[in-house]
A protein has these predicted regions:
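Aromatic/acidic polysaccharide-binding cleft in carbohydrate-active enzymes
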Residues: 318-421, 438-441
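Active-site neighborhood of glycoside hydrolase catalytic domains
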Residues: 190-208, 218-329
Length: 502
């Protein structure tokens, strides 16, 4: 184990005629993932330079509480896991949920089908079944539920699950289609009941749902796959007068309800202003859900700060992010560290917004976004699919994406991309209940964040996107240590004080 033992000055206390000696040990571990090939490797040796970058950690300055990091249980990911050999299936689940793996603590799944399903489906397909007498989650029992159960068994500390619908069943909507349209007023109570039925059905399977988002991407997706549209006023009315009261009467008031669930920026602020307008509108909202697809580089700190100002006692949770394009190459780490990825906006964004969607480095986008979110009051961060195939599916709408783990089901092979290790730098070392703490970094290129876990360990994340190695010194109170970070790399530094008995 890599350790730097720093002895405090010995404190002499004269007690009962004798001398009591006390001192602190500072146990420091450094883990690095880099373009040069490190993958969460412990680092033992560092470069030295008289011109060090000072990073000061300020545990006395505290901010938001962290609830977790993780990915999503989609039908596509679950199907692939069940298609692989038992050995590879277990290997992937252990990599995400075990103590030796990434220790995912916050996850998401979908209510009814989504684009990352093998086909369209709902839990109630009988038109005008207002009391949902034919409600059934049998479709999820094929793949999603068995995978979640296995993950629960593997996870020592457990994990939270947020469930999101992409659409109500078409018979509840004004256009009778899986894509687009709105919920008909006469089915608002039925749709609210649908959520309660879902939560209780999953409870019967031994799976506890922690929270809900009201609707995935209520502004729509161009009617390319499952969706249902709301205005901020419509969603707020639905939560205030239907969903919230229904959950309450069903004994499910502990369920966290998150509004919005789309991209950051001006729209996020507009929705938050409606949701948290007064005590009545805000009553049943536990917070706001956000996505990252508004830009390939901008994490929109101003909008995140504004939402925190509007609702400082509510959650702000990043619920979806991914590289939204086909898997480029098989087992090629270099691509993930190269400025070669394009997102949807490269082609489809309006001309006045294309500047927000330049080509980007996948690892950089993940590291920058997670750190940027943490430094701007976000409580949790969830990736999209955990596993996809070599094309970026299966996806019934041909909306191919890239996941941290890629599976070749034909040859029964698995590829852990650099994205897996990038997320693990956060999920493995920043545990639920951690509190973000203050820091100061005297460098314009490094990105830094710091938290204090409930066991009093401090985790510092340092991201170096530059092509130059950086030598730095971390200072905390009267202690400090020197280290260095390679170009194009991420580090997690764990600081733990020990007080041995003497």
């Amino acid at each position: 184990m890599t350790r730097f033992i720093l002895l405090h000055i010995i404190l002499f206390n004269f007690m009962k005629g004798g001398i009591q000696v006390q001192y602190d040990h500072l146990n420091i571990e450094v883990y690095e993932t880099s373009a040069q090939g490190n993958k969460l490797n412990k680092i033992n040796e560092f470069s030295k330079n008289i011109n060090q970058i000072l990073i000061t950690i300020k545990p006395e300055e505290t901010f938001q509480k962290i609830i977790g990091f993780g990915g999503s249980f989609t039908a596509s990911s679950a199907f692939l896991l069940n298609t692989l050999s038992q050995e590879n299936r277990n290997k992937i689940l252990a990599a995400y949920f075990s103590e030796q793996g990434a220790k995912y603590s916050l996850t998401r799944t979908h209510i009814n089908s989504c684009d990352f399903s093998l086909h369209n489906y709902a839990y109630s397909n009988i038109p005008n079944d207002k009391h949902l007498e034919h409600f059934s989650i049998d479709e999820d029992k094929k793949d999603i539920i068995p995978i979640i159960k296995d993950a629960i068994t593997i996870s020592k500390d457990g994990f939270k699950i947020i469930a999101s619908p992409w659409t109500a069943p078409p018979w509840m909507k004004d256009n009778k289609d899986w894509r687009g349209g709105k919920l008909l007023p006469e089915f608002r109570n039925t749709w609210a009941l649908y959520f309660s039925k879902y939560i209780k059905a999953y409870q019967q399977e031994g799976i506890k749902i922690w929270g809900l988002t009201v609707e995935n991407e209520p502004l729509g997706n161009g009617n390319n796959w499952e969706s249902m549209h709301y205005t901020p006023e419509e969603m707020t009315d639905f939560v205030e007068n239907y969903l919230g009261p229904n959950l309450e009467s069903a004994g499910l008031s502990y369920i966290k309800v998150l509004g919005y669930d789309q991209n950051r920026g001006d729209e996020l602020v507009r929705w938050a202003e409606v949701m948290f307008k007064n005590k009545n509108t805000a009553k049943y909202f536990s917070g706001t859900a956000i996505h990252w697809y508004g830009s390939t580089y901008d994490y929109f700190p101003e909008s995140l700060q504004r939402v925190h100002q509007l609702a400082p006692d509510k959650y702000l949770i990043q619920t979806e992010a991914c590289i939204d394009g086909e898997v480029p190459k098989w087992k090629d780490d270099t691509w993930y560290w190269s400025k070669a990825a394009k997102d949807w906006g490269w082609t489809w964004a309006p001309e006045n917004q294309k500047y927000l969607h330049p080509e980007y480095v996948p690892v950089f986008r993940y590291a920058r976004d997670i750190i940027g979110c943490l430094n701007n009051y976000v409580n949790g961060w969830i990736d999209w699919n955990m596993v996809l195939d070599k094309q970026g599916g299966p996806n019934w709408a041909n909306n191919w994406c890239t996941a941290p783990v890629i599976a070749d089901t034909v040859n029964n092979e698995v590829y852990f991309t650099p994205l897996y290790y990038t997320i693990a730098h956060f999920s493995k070392f920043i545990r639920p209940g951690a509190v973000r703490i203050g820091f100061e970094c005297l460098d314009n290129e490094l990105m830094v964040t710091a938290v204090q876990n409930t066991d009093q360990t401090i985790a510092v994340i340092v991201f170096n996107p530059s092509v130059m190695e950086k030598v730095y010194q971390i200072a905390i109170k009267k202690e400090n240590f020197n280290a260095s970070i390679q170009p194009k790399s991420i580090q997690t530094i764990i600081l733990k004080k020990l007080k041995p008995a003497i």
